[in-house]
From Swiss-Prot:
<dbReference type="InterPro" id="IPR000453">
    <property type="entry name" value="Chorismate_synth"/>
</dbReference>
<feature type="binding site">
    <location>
        <begin position="125"/>
        <end position="127"/>
    </location>
    <ligand>
        <name>FMN</name>
    </ligand>
</feature>
<feature type="region of interest" description="Disordered">
    <location>
        <begin position="37"/>
        <end position="60"/>
    </location>
</feature>
<keyword id="KW-0057">Aromatic amino acid biosynthesis</keyword>
<feature type="binding site">
    <location>
        <position position="283"/>
    </location>
    <ligand>
        <name>FMN</name>
    </ligand>
</feature>
<feature type="binding site">
    <location>
        <position position="324"/>
    </location>
    <ligand>
        <name>FMN</name>
    </ligand>
</feature>
<comment type="function">
    <text>This reaction introduces a second double bond into the aromatic ring system.</text>
</comment>
<feature type="binding site">
    <location>
        <begin position="243"/>
        <end position="244"/>
    </location>
    <ligand>
        <name>FMN</name>
    </ligand>
</feature>
<dbReference type="GO" id="GO:0009423">
    <property type="term" value="P:chorismate biosynthetic process"/>
</dbReference>
<dbReference type="GO" id="GO:0009073">
    <property type="term" value="P:aromatic amino acid family biosynthetic process"/>
</dbReference>
<keyword id="KW-0456">Lyase</keyword>
<keyword id="KW-0288">FMN</keyword>
<feature type="binding site">
    <location>
        <position position="48"/>
    </location>
    <ligand>
        <name>NADP(+)</name>
    </ligand>
</feature>
<dbReference type="GO" id="GO:0005829">
    <property type="term" value="C:cytosol"/>
</dbReference>
<keyword id="KW-0285">Flavoprotein</keyword>
<dbReference type="GO" id="GO:0010181">
    <property type="term" value="F:FMN binding"/>
</dbReference>
<dbReference type="Pfam" id="PF01264">
    <property type="entry name" value="Chorismate_synt"/>
</dbReference>
């Protein structure tokens, strides 16, 4: 399995499985003399960790990160930063029934077909549990971006099922409100509707999809390496690598299909851009406007409603998922998406500095 690393100058490699001893990552390319401790990383992990509200999986993990290397006397040394998070609340016995069966909609079938073996306990490497280390690495990237470039990377939940929040304008979002409710939602009226929907889904044993938006503000002009390492292409690659993500939009995204050129083009005046339909990226290069990326996440297939599938012998079976799972994986995906955007931006900033200035 060779796809465990992302980035060129700022490189993140993760390892570990859902029910293994621990999760870990190696972060290369962090510039020296950045003040860093576990306290800088833990808040984002706490936003992502399971068991923090009645709307997410009841699996409880402290997700306490430990820095193993790359930091001396409270500052980064420029060497590889190693981090681990120990797993503590595994219930592997919950997955005995699917040892020889494939859960429909999961990676069970494809992992088995590709590798001839799979860790069926909680999905193993394919579990969203792995994303904890992405969040840890992303927290480092976010700190460096904020302190050295004034760049803020923040996200919010914009839709669950058919419930959409009111349109949000960049610069007018109440981020304290976003982080004060379990849905990471800036629209109070939508929070109540989300609550009602999730409660109903939990009674039914079903799940639902979601959409969330990440905004990066104060990104300078010039990030992106055409033609194959365009900034939007790398953002899409990183965001599509998140479990359950089935679609990525930059700026207006798929809505451009209904727009005319006279509407979509972001006209300019001596005072700046008149609009931001492009989401802060033109020709694969950042324009200096806020970068706006939206992702769609599928409803998790880990539900208690019986589903048809096959076993290792290709025979028809019925699968009922046990274990503890999220009724909507999009809720905890906000800090994960923020992390992936931050990782890409820092990588491109370092590449920009090396080549252009």
């Amino acid at each position: 399995m060779a796809g465990n690393t992302i980035g060129q100058l700022f490189r993140v490699t993760t390892f570990g499985e859902s029910h293994g001893i621990a999760l870990g990552c190696i972060v290369d390319g962090v510039p020296p003399n950045l003040e860093l401790s576990e306290k800088d990383i833990q808040p984002d992990l706490d936003r992502r960790k399971p068991g923090t509200s009645r709307y997410t999986t009841p699996r409880r993990e402290d997700d306490e990160v430990q820095i193993l290397s790359g930091v001396f006397e409270g500052k980064t040394t420029g060497t590889s930063i190693g981090m681990i998070i120990k797993n503590g609340d595994q219930r592997s016995q919950d997955y005995g029934d699917i040892k020889d069966r494939f859960r429909p909609g999961h990676a069970d079938f494809t992992y088995q077909q590709k590798y001839g073996i799979r860790d069926y306990r909680g999905g193993g490497r394919s579990s969203a549990r792995e994303t904890a280390m992405r969040v840890a690495a992303g927290a480092i990237a976010k700190k460096y971006l904020r302190e050295h470039f004034g760049i803020e990377v923040r996200g919010f939940l914009s839709q669950i099922g058919n419930i959409k929040i009111a349109p949000q304008k960049v610069g007018q979002i109440d981020w304290e409100k976003v982080n004060s409710n379990p849905f990471f939602c800036p629209d109070e009226s939508a929070v109540e509707k989300f609550d009602e929907l999730i409660r109903e889904l939990k009674k039914e044993g079903d799940s639902i999809g979601a959409k969330l938006t990440v905004i990066a503000e104060n990104v300078p002009v010039g990030l992106g390496e055409p033609v194959f390492d365009r900034l939007d292409a790398d953002l899409a690659h990183a965001l599509m690598g998140i479990n359950a993500v089935k679609g990525v939009e930059i700026g207006d995204g798929f809505a451009v299909v209904e727009q005319r050129g006279s509407e979509h083009r972001d006209e300019m005046t001596p005072n700046g851009f008149e609009s931001n339909h492009a989401g802060g990226i033109l020709g694969g290069i950042s324009s200096g406007q806020p970068i706006i990326a939206t992702i769609a996440l599928k409803p998790t297939s880990s539900i208690t409603i019986p589903g048809r599938s096959i076993n290792l012998n290709g025979e028809a079976v019925e699968v009922v998922t046990k274990g503890r799972h999220d009724p909507c994986v999009g809720i905890r995906a906000v800090p994960i998406a923020e992390a992936m955007v931050a990782i890409v931006l820092l990588d491109h900033l370092l590449r920009f500095k090396a080549q252009c200035k």
